Amino acid sequence: MYFPPSSVPKRLVLVHISAVVAIKLLLIRSVSSLNMTNAYLQHKCIVSEGKYQPGSVYEKNLNIIIRASSAGDFRSGFDLVFRGKGSNFVTLMYQCRGDSYWSRCRSCYTTALSALRKRCSRNKGGIIWYDQCLMEISSIRNEGKLDYNNNFCMSNTKNASGSPLEFKQKMVDFLLNLGLKATSEDNMDKYNQAVMYAMGEERVGTKKLYAMVQCTKDLWLKTCYACLEWIILKESDCCDGKLGGRVFSTSCNYRYELYPFIKPTV
């Protein structure tokens, strides 16, 4: 198991209120600029895996691994648990974004689990993506394997000015370099586990790009880079020449924007 009095002059009251409003607006802009929300992005029910019956061994196994996974401390932002054999085998995997571990990861996990069980009720297989985490429940043992079938893309509606091809090439080079950083053998956390995540910024012409790449922690380093290379080079058509874009699979993902959206990690 990867187991927050009437005697006072009106002018002072107005100044005080204006200051409070200004502070609130500043906080809102700060949070917005770092995209500290946890928006729902996409989900997919894997109908080919079939459904389970209420009270079945499969459901009991699912509830057991949910309890086991929920009891974790979410410090690494990842867990993979499984139980059962044959038609009663079930596995649950979640991966939180690299800046969303501990309590933020737990919050996203709870939200994702509830939503996935509602959206894919009784399905043996299902995947859900949120801004800060990914969750997959499956009846198929697939840890360490690349998933080429379940992916999607989101992009900014605005195009880059100047040469779209030049912008794309610089963006691709930037993301691939982040992929190398994410899969470096030196990229370990304090528990001596591979981080499988990297973020950075780079100037492209007059603009500054902010980006991140990440893999699920069940992958080997080489497999992680292969996944990132695949989505960056093969699955990014919807992002071509766009001022921002994201590509997700169940194995890896990337994102780039013209504004900072990642909370710096310690």
UniProtKB/Swiss-Prot annotation:
Coiled coil: none annotated. PROSITE patterns: GNK2. Keywords: Repeat, Secreted, Signal. It comes from the Eukaryota. CDD domains: Gnk2-like. Residues 40-142, 148-261 form the Gnk2-homologous domain. The keyword Electron transport does not apply. GO terms for cellular component: extracellular region. Belongs to the cysteine-rich repeat secretory protein family. This is Putative cysteine-rich repeat secretory protein 20. It comes from Arabidopsis thaliana (Mouse-ear cress). The lineage of its organism: Eukaryota, Viridiplantae, Streptophyta, Embryophyta, Tracheophyta.
